[in-house]
Amino acid sequence: MDKFKEIRPIVLGIVKRDDKILVSKGYDKIKNETFYRSIGGGIEFLENSKEALKREFKEELNIDINVGDFLGISENIFTYNGRNAHELILFYNVEISDSNYKEKYHIIDDNCETDAMWINIDKFINKELKIYPE
């Protein structure tokens, strides 16, 4: 089945440092829109959400994390690059050690390249920058 025609379970980690959160930068070429999203990804069959989050951080940022408290779940129905998608998202607090701290991380995921960076949370609250899911 086409992955854009099913409900996809994903997990995202909320990483805070001072007044900033760690997010990856994305771009929707159909909407001509730059957006940001917390780090994470799909939960594989028979994989629990905490293990999926650890795996995603290792794959995307090459760092080990400590998964903290469960923050909640959200349903996200959206269009990305002209295709409909539907996600159920589990959110966790995440901690990274000082030895893994960088101002910017380069991500290569599914043959796409982007960066993850620390952005002041006020930029999202004040709607200066777009974060998904809202």
Predicted features and spans:
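Unchanged
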Residues: 43-66, 76-129
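Conserved N-terminal beta-strand and adjoining loop/helix that marks the start
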Residues: 1-22, 42, 93
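Short, flexible active-site-adjacent loop segments at beta-strand->alpha-helix junctions, enriched
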Residues: 19, 27-28, 74-76, 96-98
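Short secondary-structure boundary/capping segments
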Residues: 3-5, 13, 28, 82, ...
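Charged phosphate-binding loop/patch that engages nucleotide di/tri-phosphates or the phosphate backbone
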Residues: 130-134
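A generic fold-level signal
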Residues: 6-8, 16, 31, 84-87, ...
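Conserved Nudix-box catalytic region and its N-terminal flanking loop in Nudix hydrolases
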Residues: 20-59
